[in-house]
Amino acid sequence: MNPVPAQREYFLDSIRAWLMLLGIPFHISLIYSSHTWHVNSAESSLWLTLFNDFIHSFRMQVFFVISGYFSYMLFLRYPLKKWWKVRVERVGIPMLTAIPLLTLPQFIMLQYVKGKAESWPGLSLYDKYNTLAWELISHLWFLLVLVVMTTLCVWIFKRIRNNLENSDKTNKKFSMVKLSVIFLCLGIGYAVIRRTIFIVYPPILSNGMFNFIVMQTLFYLPFFILGALAFIFPHLKALFTTPSRGCTLAAALAFVAYLLNQRYGSGDAWMYETESVITMVLGLWMVNVVFSFGHRLLNFQSARVTYFVNASLFIYLVHHPLTLFFGAYITPHITSNWLGFLCGLIFVVGIAIILYEIHLRIPLLKFLFSGKPVVKRENDKAPAR
């Protein structure tokens, strides 16, 4: 069993928090992009569309690598059953809390904003179920995927640990070229699976729960496992934290290919399959870009950084309904897209931080939005000496 390093990986904590918080400008820019969303501005902005595409092309791939890294670290710290329980509680409880408190009111608001409240009774039972699946899971999808991945990794991590006990991990060598070939093959494999499903039974791809539990898990699981391997093998971690011009250039070219596919691809043709191949390798290369950047600039302890690391999940959970409220009721009154984008950031971040501070003072909400039981310090009750 590998010892858990005593030194905290501050840069990984910071990167994970910033990737979470990037969801705020991502969703606000989505309002002003050329992409169709729940709410959109009257005129789209080319630069905000480009900004939105850039964030979307790599953010979650890097996020799941970091999640896999910390998951395996905890896997070595706890017994198997306790590890699964702790991990599922920390992501499952906030997800289940956010559904009635955040995404259900968000869904009701959108029904009236989009004028669909009157047509709801006429929907079939399946359409109601599927609509609720999409709308209630909403931006919480990654928490559901983490629950599924954690359950799958009960077996996967055990196999990895057993294989390590029977082999010499110091002889394991990694190169970005080999990893790129592997992830290219994984992207092609995912594309083949998706195309096969599209040919055999296309309606299942529109099923919300199938999309989240099967397709999203299938795509992001390699990144999750890559994160675990980066924890196990120092050489692999060093490969990601060492700046690489090759990875930076390859990521830039892959992003151009991603944009071209977005602009000229067709959903009825091969756009989604092509995107999966591009974003699979782009995500790998961006792990190097983000990790090396973060390792150089964010590998330090700071009270301010720690605050946002702790607040990032709560802020992400509440930002989505706030963003949609802003888009539905405030965006129409702001003629400038860039001014609207900046106002949206101030509006959403400001209210989210206020709500975060309020919830910290309510023990039940603090538990529900973190999944961590509130521990009372015995020292607080001890008499002064």
Curated annotation (Swiss-Prot):
<feature type="transmembrane region" description="Helical">
    <location>
        <begin position="173"/>
        <end position="193"/>
    </location>
</feature>
<dbReference type="GO" id="GO:0005886">
    <property type="term" value="C:plasma membrane"/>
</dbReference>
<feature type="transmembrane region" description="Helical">
    <location>
        <begin position="239"/>
        <end position="259"/>
    </location>
</feature>
<dbReference type="GO" id="GO:1900727">
    <property type="term" value="P:osmoregulated periplasmic glucan biosynthetic process"/>
</dbReference>
<dbReference type="InterPro" id="IPR050623">
    <property type="entry name" value="Glucan_succinyl_AcylTrfase"/>
</dbReference>
<dbReference type="InterPro" id="IPR023723">
    <property type="entry name" value="Glucans_biosynth_C"/>
</dbReference>
<keyword id="KW-0012">Acyltransferase</keyword>
<comment type="pathway">
    <text>Glycan metabolism; osmoregulated periplasmic glucan (OPG) biosynthesis.</text>
</comment>
<feature type="transmembrane region" description="Helical">
    <location>
        <begin position="338"/>
        <end position="358"/>
    </location>
</feature>
<protein>
    <recommendedName>
        <fullName>Glucans biosynthesis protein C</fullName>
        <ecNumber>2.1.-.-</ecNumber>
    </recommendedName>
</protein>
<dbReference type="GO" id="GO:0016748">
    <property type="term" value="F:succinyltransferase activity"/>
</dbReference>
<keyword id="KW-0812">Transmembrane</keyword>
<feature type="transmembrane region" description="Helical">
    <location>
        <begin position="60"/>
        <end position="80"/>
    </location>
</feature>
<comment type="function">
    <text>Necessary for the succinyl substitution of periplasmic glucans. Could catalyze the transfer of succinyl residues from the cytoplasmic side of the membrane to the nascent glucan backbones on the periplasmic side of the membrane.</text>
</comment>
<dbReference type="Pfam" id="PF01757">
    <property type="entry name" value="Acyl_transf_3"/>
</dbReference>
<keyword id="KW-1133">Transmembrane helix</keyword>
<keyword id="KW-0808">Transferase</keyword>
<keyword id="KW-1003">Cell membrane</keyword>
<keyword id="KW-0472">Membrane</keyword>
<feature type="transmembrane region" description="Helical">
    <location>
        <begin position="213"/>
        <end position="233"/>
    </location>
</feature>
<comment type="similarity">
    <text>Belongs to the acyltransferase 3 family. OpgC subfamily.</text>
</comment>
<feature type="transmembrane region" description="Helical">
    <location>
        <begin position="17"/>
        <end position="37"/>
    </location>
</feature>
<feature type="transmembrane region" description="Helical">
    <location>
        <begin position="274"/>
        <end position="294"/>
    </location>
</feature>
<feature type="transmembrane region" description="Helical">
    <location>
        <begin position="137"/>
        <end position="157"/>
    </location>
</feature>
<dbReference type="GO" id="GO:0016741">
    <property type="term" value="F:transferase activity, transferring one-carbon groups"/>
</dbReference>
<dbReference type="InterPro" id="IPR002656">
    <property type="entry name" value="Acyl_transf_3_dom"/>
</dbReference>
<feature type="transmembrane region" description="Helical">
    <location>
        <begin position="91"/>
        <end position="111"/>
    </location>
</feature>
<feature type="transmembrane region" description="Helical">
    <location>
        <begin position="311"/>
        <end position="331"/>
    </location>
</feature>
